[in-house]
Design a protein with these regions (language model features):
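A short amphipathic helical element positioned immediately N-terminal to and/or at the very start
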Residues: 36-44, 112, 217-229
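Hydrophobic alpha-helical transmembrane segments
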Residues: 50-54, 81-86, 162-167, 235-240, ...
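Membrane-embedded helical hairpins/re-entrant loop segments and their flanking transmembrane helices
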Residues: 65-89, 256-273
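Transmembrane helical segments that form the transport core of multi-pass membrane transport proteins
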Residues: 222, 227-276
């Protein structure tokens, strides 16, 4: 019997974690006698509000892609919106099936590279988008705290450790992204350590070549981030897009609330609870924050739904916030893979599909990055120099 590869074992483990969470929720519901109630609640769910939930999910995904699309436009890089949307969905899928969402951004960088987007530019775009999303989430959490202090205080009392940890980790992450974007030496040192580790683990064969490519990507990264720091209006535009994106994602809970026939709580109250839940559970080191999201929903929303509808609301909410992304994202991954295979079979030398960027030589990408930064600035290979000094 052929042994599974390390990647296959990892994928299998992640799938089992997701499946275990589903089974556990159903088991607990059955044990408490809630399955029948959940079934009746789901059958009686109001269709207009289910469509609204699908609409807010679509809004979340469209503005996820819009942030990348606008960033590339700001960098004078014409990436079609459909490419940004497809790659965003691919990234969402891999984020959903890997622990702590660690697989999303690397796959997005790889997908953009296949379409001719320099690695440094796509990396900086994803970093800026991540920074804007986390900032928008924390800012919205702060606003909700001011608007509904009693409701937030009650949630904190119920899940003090979860909420406090979530705020701290999100805040530290934002600060870390800022530090990495500003301080080139820290980033360069981290990359050097990673290359050394890769060499020691026999993952990196040619240290000089790897360092050269990493340095070229680093030049692209800081050139595009520097451009944003010198044009704060552009950064504010990206922040505005992220605010709309977060509102779309957080509004799913209100649509589910109304779909279950509830109307006593105001939109802002449900929004406050959902934002707190997202902040508290987002850094759980399991695929899709499984377990923390479901437990947090019970913890924060138990007073918003009748007991007979709570499990049904949880299942419906989890479908729109997680499983729908898995389904659509998987479709995008399969479609993209099938399209790549089809094009390779048709002609190994075929150009990228219409609308994609031509894949440029590494030297051309370096020149483009240098022009973004300063047309007269010489490109330096600091990583190689660091390697020579250390050796």
């Amino acid at each position: 019997m052929k042994k599974l590869t390390k990647r296959a074992r990892s994928n299998l483990l992640n799938a089992l974690v997701i499946l275990f969470t589903i089974v556990l929720v159903i088991y607990l519901g059955a044990k408490n006698g809630d399955i029948g109630d959940a079934y009746r609640a789901l059958r009686s769910a109001r269709t207009p509000w289910l469509l609204a939930a699908a609409g807010t999910w679509s809004m979340f995904m469209v503005f996820e892609a819009m942030g990348l699309h606008v960033f590339f436009r700001q960098q004078k890089l014409k990436v079609p919106f459909r490419t940004s949307l497809l790659v965003s969905m691919i990234g969402m899928f891999y984020s959903s099936v890997t622990p702590a969402a660690t697989g999303g951004q690397p796959m997005q960088v790889f997908s953009f590279k296949k379409r001719g987007v320099p690695t440094g530019l796509s990396s900086s775009g994803l970093a800026v988008k991540f920074f804007c999303y986390q900032t928008a989430l924390l800012a919205l959490g702060g606003v909700m705290w001011l608007v509904h202090p009693g409701l937030v205080a009650d949630c904190i009392n119920r899940g003090r450790v979860l909420v406090a940890t979530g705020f701290v980790l999100n805040g530290v992450t934002v600060a870390l992204v800022l530090l990495l974007a500003i301080n080139k030496n820290i980033v360069r040192g981290i990359i050097t350590l990673l290359i050394r580790a890769g060499k020691a683990l026999h993952l990196v064969k040619d240290v000089a070549k790897t360092a050269s490519r990493a340095d070229a990507a680093l030049v692209d990264f800081h050139a595009s981030v520097d451009m944003l720091t010198h044009h704060p209006v552009r950064l504010l535009v990206l922040l505005g897009i992220s605010v709309v994106q977060v509102l779309g994602q957080m509004s799913i809970a209100y649509c589910v609330y109304r779909a279950m026939g509830q109307s006593a709580a105001a939109y802002s109250e449900i929004l406050a609870l959902q934002v707190l839940l997202q902040i508290a559970a987002s850094f759980t080191p399991l695929p899709g924050a499984s377990g923390a999201q479901e437990g947090g929903f019970y913890l924060f929303f138990q007073d918003m739904f009748p007991e007979s509808k709570l499990l049904g609301a949880l299942l419906l909410w989890r479908f729109f916030t997680y499983y729908l992304t898995l389904i659509v994202g998987l479709g995008c991954v399969i479609g993209d893979s099938a399209d790549s295979i089809r094009r390779r079979k048709r002609s190994p030398l075929e150009q990228p599909e219409k609308g994609d960027l031509p894949i440029e030589p590494e030297e051309t990408q370096r020149e483009a990055a240098a022009n973004l930064r300063n047309p007269a600035a010489p490109a330096t290979n600091n990583l190689q120099e660091t390697e020579r000094e250390n050796s």
